[in-house]
Amino acid sequence: HHIEPLVTISHYEMPYALVEKYNGWEGRECIALFEKYCKVIFERYQHKVKYWLTFNEINSGTTKLGNVLSTSTVKGYTGPITQVPDSMQARYQALHHQFVASARVVKYAHEHYPQFKLGNMICFITSYPYTCRPEDILEAQHQMRNMNWYCSDVQVRGEYPYYAKKFW
């Protein structure tokens, strides 16, 4: 049927030892470890897989639930998922490390496996204004920008969007 696989390299999983040692993606060390992992799977599957995604729904890291799902910044936590402690600083530091890891892996793949096509994906969440009041419209735009465009701008354009400095 001429179906070709599309592999998502990281789909909400992180070895528990790395969560405990580095607090997941908050630890810069995870960048090199991800690169090493990707080099192994690229070599192993170079003749079977052409299409790759580096991270599943990377923008989930902008949310509190992203501590568990995407960035794995939950070192030492053993309670309910609904009560995960939240640190916006840790989440966005972890996201930055994922962006760097993704960029490095894409660069490596293009240099060593020109047949590969690498991309990214987000969990696009539409936000509608509650009313037609200007403040509700602006809030909906703000939610769309921070939830959807922030991560996709970095991954597609290779740089943080202009509003990121205001957000940080």
Please state what every model-predicted region is.
Residues 1-168:
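Non-catalytic scaffold segments within catalytic domains of secreted glycoside hydrolases
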